[in-house]
């Protein structure tokens, strides 16, 4: 996914231009009017590898891009101000219909040139009925 090209300053609305501020850092958008530096922060996403009561893993089939039609474990973006584990529990409930318990951290993943940092948890299904939402086939 290509990064978004920002053209205007979020502080004053002035024109942005790309500048090299430090030799050891990437070029950054800087406002020509007020000097505000725009830092393009990564998004944080969570995923849960859920063990069901019959020792099977829970997967959902994506109904949206990217990855339409692919089988994945439940996950999604963390909302601003939301605790990471709360986001993992919410995404699991929304995408699978299951209430879960977070059992531990699997790993944290990031890939060069891509925005999301993905935090993956191990979880156990506690209840609910397996069903998908509008993001799942």
Task: Identify the meaning behind each predicted range.
Residues 33, 66-68, 73, 104, ...:
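Residue-level signal for pocket-adjacent positions within structured domains
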Residues 39, 58-59, 132:
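A sequence-level detector of short linear motifs
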Residues 78-137:
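Unchanged
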């Amino acid at each position: 996914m290509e990064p978004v090209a920002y053209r205007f300053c979020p502080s004053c609305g002035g024109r942005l231009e790309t500048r090299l501020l430090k030799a050891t850092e990437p070029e950054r958008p800087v406002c020509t009017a007020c000097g505000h530096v725009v830092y393009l922060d990564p998004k944080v996403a969570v995923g849960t590898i859920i063990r069901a009561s019959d020792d099977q893993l829970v997967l959902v089939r994506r109904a949206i891009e990217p990855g339409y039609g692919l089988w994945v474990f439940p996950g999604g973006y963390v909302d601003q101000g939301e605790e990471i584990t709360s986001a993992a529990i919410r995404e699991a409930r929304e995408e699978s219909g299951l209430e879960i318990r977070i059992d531990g951290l699997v790993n944290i993943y990031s890939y060069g040139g891509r925005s999301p940092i993905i935090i993956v948890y191990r979880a156990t299904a506690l209840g609910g009925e397996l069903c998908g939402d509008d993001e799942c086939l």
